Structure formats: C-alpha cells, structure tokens
C-alpha cells in the first residue's frame, strides 16, 4: 500500500516544553503517561482522543509533544497541569509550537548548571544550592525524607 500524499495526511503540530526543575531526569514513557493523564483529566476522554497527544522525545530538560492541528492550545494548557512524573515533582512550561520538530530543535538551548556547589542554612534546615543562568537558584533540602525544593534568585540568596 502506498503512503498518502502530503495533502491527504493529518496535519500535526509539535509543542516544545521545558521541564522544571532543570535537574529532573524523566523517562519518556513516564512523561507520556503523565501527559495523557493531564489531557484526559482536563479535556475529557473524547477531546483528548481527538487531540491525540504523544510524547515524541524527552531529553536535555525539554519535552516535545505531538498533537493534531487545531488542538495545540488545549494540549499546551494540559501540559501546564502536569505536576509529577513517576513520583518526581516537576512543572512543564510551554516554550514554542511549530509544525516541524526541526524548528523546535533550533529553539532548544542547553541548560547548564553553573559551578559552585554550596550549602546554606535557612532556619534550622540545611539546603544544597544549585545555580543556573539568569540568576536562578534552586535550594534542595538536605536529608533522606520529606525533601522540599525552594526557588530563589541571587538577590534572595544574598539577603539570607
């Protein structure tokens, strides 16, 4: 059977989203399950089925989600409702929407952690400091159980 000509194929859109916090390591399959769950809970089974969201790839702090043309706004809203993937708390922030994956790859910027591992004490709790470009600072509580993340800027950290 011959493939369909381009004019008869279903049009697709691709959504580029950034995974926050930057250090989160997420499996593509688990991300797919989280996106489908978010789309189904927000849009319902029928609308999520029509949108056909699928995770194309998930690497380097970014995820690319494929959907049908005309449903990209609904899927982008559903992406913002994702709060956890495989028991790891994350957030997805939509960066761009395009008709090709190649155009989205040009929009991806490598996220590098700045050098300087530190430790800071706030109240009675010790936090590990992770610095990123644009004066972003993540504080992760030291310990085994009940870890929590705090998000600061350079100015907030200097005040402490």
Swiss-Prot record:
Consists of a catalytic RNA component and at least 4-5 protein subunits. It comes from the Archaea. It comes from Methanoculleus marisnigri (strain ATCC 35101 / DSM 1498 / JR1). This is Ribonuclease P protein component 2. One of its GO terms (molecular function) is ribonuclease P activity. Part of ribonuclease P, a protein complex that generates mature tRNA molecules by cleaving their 5'-ends. Keywords: Cytoplasm, Endonuclease, Hydrolase, Nuclease, tRNA processing. Its EC number is 3.1.26.5.
């Amino acid at each position: 059977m011959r493939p369909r000509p381009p004019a008869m194929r279903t049009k697709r859109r691709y959504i580029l989203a950034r995974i926050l916090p930057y250090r989160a390591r997420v499996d593509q399959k688990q991300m797919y399950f989280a996106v489908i769950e978010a789309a189904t809970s927000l849009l319902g089974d029928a609308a999520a089925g029509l949108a056909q969201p699928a995770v194309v790839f998930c690497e380097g702090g970014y995820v690319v989600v494929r959907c049908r043309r005309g449903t990209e706004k609904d899927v982008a809203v559903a992406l913002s409702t994702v709060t956890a993937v495989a028991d790891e708390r994350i957030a997805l922030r939509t960066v761009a929407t395009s008709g090709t994956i190649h155009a989205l790859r040009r929009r991806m910027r490598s996220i590098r952690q700045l050098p300087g591992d530190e430790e800071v004490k706030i109240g009675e709790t010790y936090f590990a400091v992770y610095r990123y470009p644009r004066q972003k600072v993540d504080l992760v509580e030291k310990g085994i159980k009940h870890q929590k993340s705090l998000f600061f800027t350079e100015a907030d950290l200097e005040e402490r």
